[in-house]
Amino acid sequence: MHRYRTLLFVLLTACMCNAVFAAIELGQVAPNIEGALLDGKPFSLQAHKGKVVLVNFWASWCEPCREEMPIIEAYLKKNKSKGFEVLAITMDKPLDIEQAQKIMQKYSFLSADKKQINYSGYGRIWRIPSTFIIDKQGILRKNGLTGDPTVDTKLLEEIVTPLLSGH
């Protein structure tokens, strides 16, 4: 009986993992994200159609997250006029939100707290940083739950730049 219970647990776990990853696929319409930004303004990913949007899940205690932010900011400043936007969603606990807000003051990203915004269509965010890139038509072009989680200039130039130029 114990052997069957263990097998059932393994199968159910595998199915749940597949459901999380199957929830969002490259080349498909990206699920909407909507709610309130840290500044209180409303946000809806659907309202940003026509722009390339980088959605970055991060936390104030995450060193790789903080290291990639200046790179993303520099790219945003260079390409905002071409239709590039960044939404940074902090995964911090409520006690750390003040620290996250302090960090966000250095950047021109749209920023939100995970408790104030609905991103359920992206499945369980199990690692940070996790970065998703959505093209001007609302199609997912980078899935932050797979591959290398790091955002650097090379990735931005390879994925985002062609999307901005329409190629």
What are these regions (language model features)?
Residues 24, 37-38, 134-135:
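Short, acidic, Ser/Thr-enriched surface-loop or helix-capping motifs
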Residues 101-109, 114-159:
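Thiol/disulfide oxidoreductase modules built on the thioredoxin-like
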Residues 32-53:
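A short beta-strand-turn-helix
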Residues 1-3:
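N-terminal secretory signal peptides that target proteins for export/translocation
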Residues 51-53, 57-61, 127:
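Short pre-active-site segment immediately N-terminal to redox-active cysteine/selenocysteine motifs
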Residues 6, 12-32:
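N-proximal helix/coil linker or "cap" segments that precede and/or mark the start of modular domains
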Residues 66-106, 116-121:
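Structural microenvironment flanking redox-active thiols in thiol-disulfide oxidoreductases
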